[in-house]
């Protein structure tokens, strides 16, 4: 059992869990957000960033949805069992833009230009070729 006041989970013996659990899914679409109910298997573990499929006929939207947040009571959690959930927050997969990761090279504070030779020794630039990779 999950306590809605303190948030702790207690083990209760003899309690039968139903086969299917109805959980509310709030879909945050750009044009038209909507609420939908989905039936999940008892004991199914859901996590943020997982995909969930809703009924195309009832939602009118055929794209898979990405779980953006899971809500238990008033708390948002990264993962939860189906029977603990109050609300699943989701967005259509085609409305999510993934940030491009740019490869950023940092220059070392001690560049070859700062290395000077002392009497009778050669500089690093005589043995190494400086290549610009940008």
From Swiss-Prot:
Citing just one GO molecular function, the answer is: DNA binding
What induces the gene encoding this protein? Induced by nitrogen-limited conditions.
- Residues passing through the membrane, by range: none
Q: Does the keyword Metal-binding apply?
A: yes
Annotated zinc fingers (C4-type), start-end: 3-36
Q: Which UniProt keywords apply?
A: Activator, DNA-binding, Metal-binding, Transcription, Transcription regulation, Zinc, Zinc-finger
Q: What happens when the gene is disrupted?
A: Under nitrogen-limited conditions, mutant shows a considerably changed growth rate and a prolonged lag phase. Level of NifH is significantly decreased.
Entry's InterPro entries?
Znf_CPxCG-like (IPR012041)
Functional note? Involved in nitrogen regulation. Enhances the transcription of the nitrogen fixation (nif) operon under nitrogen-limited conditions. Acts by binding to the nifH promoter region.
Q: Quote the subunit structure annotation.
A: Interacts with the general archaeal transcription factors TBPs.
Q: Which PANTHER family match?
A: UCP015877 FAMILY PROTEIN, ZINC FINGER PROTEIN
User: What is the name of the protein in this document?
Assistant: Nif-regulating protein A
Upper lineage is:
Archaea, Methanobacteriati, Methanobacteriota, Stenosarchaea group, Methanomicrobia
